Amino acid sequence: MIKYVLISALLVVAVYSFTIEDSEDALLEEAEDELDTEEERRMALPPGAVCNGHKSDCQCFGAKYKCSCPFLWRFRRSAKCHCKKGWAWTAIKKRSCHNRYQWSG
């Protein structure tokens, strides 16, 4: 009986240590995301400018502008993404951008 209690306690401690480690990783990721949003707040790229395809569409100036990348752009070195006009749903998606005050009237 005591063996089962000890094994159960060890399992609880092991699971607890993993959850603490995961929460620390999550806090670090949140801090990095906050830094990225600070950069997005500071500047928005004009239409036609080269943008980073790995980041959100918030980097492009305007409610309907999005970062548009060519087909298989990740595998071609010369391929670059540009801020181009998107559809109406792009404006709906960009309502949650932190830098929307720059282009909203």
UniProtKB/Swiss-Prot annotation:
Pfam families in alphabetical order: Toxin_34
Keyword terms, alphabetized: Disulfide bond, Ion channel impairing toxin, Neurotoxin, Potassium channel impairing toxin, Secreted, Signal, Toxin, Voltage-gated potassium channel impairing toxin
Main location class: secreted
Location relative to the cell: Secreted
GO MF assignments: potassium channel regulator activity; toxin activity
Described function: Insecticidal to house crickets. It induces an excitatory slow-onset impact that leads to irreversible spastic paralysis. It also modifies human voltage-gated potassium channel Kv1.5/KCNA5. Most likely, it binds to the voltage-sensing domain of the channel, suggesting it does not block the pore but prevents its opening at physiological membrane potentials. The recombinant peptide binds to the channel in an irreversible manner and slows down the hKv1.5 current activation kinetics. It is not toxic to mice, when intracranially injected (at 0.5 ug/g mouse).
Protein name, as recorded: U2-lycotoxin-Ls1c
Annotated source species: Lycosa singoriensis (Wolf spider)
